[in-house]
Amino acid sequence: MRGMRFARPARIAAAGAALAATVSLLSTPQAGAAPICPDAGRAPVLVGRAPGAAIEGAAVDGAGRLYVTDLRSNRVLRIDRPGAPAVPFATVPGPMGGGLAFAPDGGLLVGYGDARVFVGDVARPAGIVKIDVGTGAVAPFASGLSAANGLAVTRDGTVYATNDLASLVGRVLPNGVVQPDWAVLPSANGAALSADDRYLYVSRTFVNPGVSRIPLANPAAPESLVDFGGADMFVAPDGLVLDALGRPIVPTDISGEILRVDGHNRYCALAGGLQGSSVLTFGSGGSGFSAGRLFRAGFDGDIYEIGA
């Protein structure tokens, strides 16, 4: 995985064994390669670059500006439009967790502090800060979480936070109460909410790789949508999104595919050849990284537009 050697050490250690096992698998033409989606669009187009960054999280504001988290510098970077330079926007305290999401009031939520993700379920060292996108001011938002690799926010302001290297999924209520053990799902990574706020969708990166959804009303009963097996066992799904039809679209760290889930254990590739893909985000607004467009960012610091 390009760029991974400088990224979060704990994650590299976990990914190392999977990557080594994958080398022989990927040497065969069909290994780890999903069928191409019949409606896949054009080939990926490079639209941005953050030189030297290892991007873990990405989100677009209403003005079409792209924000990304850099695991190497603990900074949030901003790219105002495709082709524009990535500029430092804010620095978070402690090690970068990577998750990014917008609160209902427009503030940018950023996960931090999960350098000890393997023991995060016990130590709960992670938290979330809130950034004013107008001024760049950083303020505390929540603490006491296992990790915050993925963040998702409901319409009422409830925040969900995942940990790709442990098991706890945390919840922060609108009144500020933190529930670090709201759900248990090993290696839950990324976070995306259904349009009706009934389900939290997550990738399972390192343990039983696949995609699950967790009913918000019954977090003890997660449902598996995809179980990657065979040659696909080592694809390492990461920060996913849902399309307009509610279908999960998942980037893969190792195989470099952008996969769309069309049904139970049915998936196809919208794009390939993008090793180190860590996160997807849809655009917003009428200009810049605009609404209706899908963007991929990765540990290589590159941002691509994906035909979807």
Which sequence ranges carry the predicted segments?
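Secretory targeting and sorting signals
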Residues: 1-33
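Blade/loop signatures of beta-propeller domains
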Residues: 32-41, 73
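A short beta-strand motif characteristic of beta-propeller blades
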Residues: 42-49, 84-91, 136-142, 177-183, ...
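Beta-propeller domains
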Residues: 68-91
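A short loop-to-beta-strand structural motif that recurs across blades of beta-propeller domains
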Residues: 75-78, 126-129, 168-171, 210-212, ...
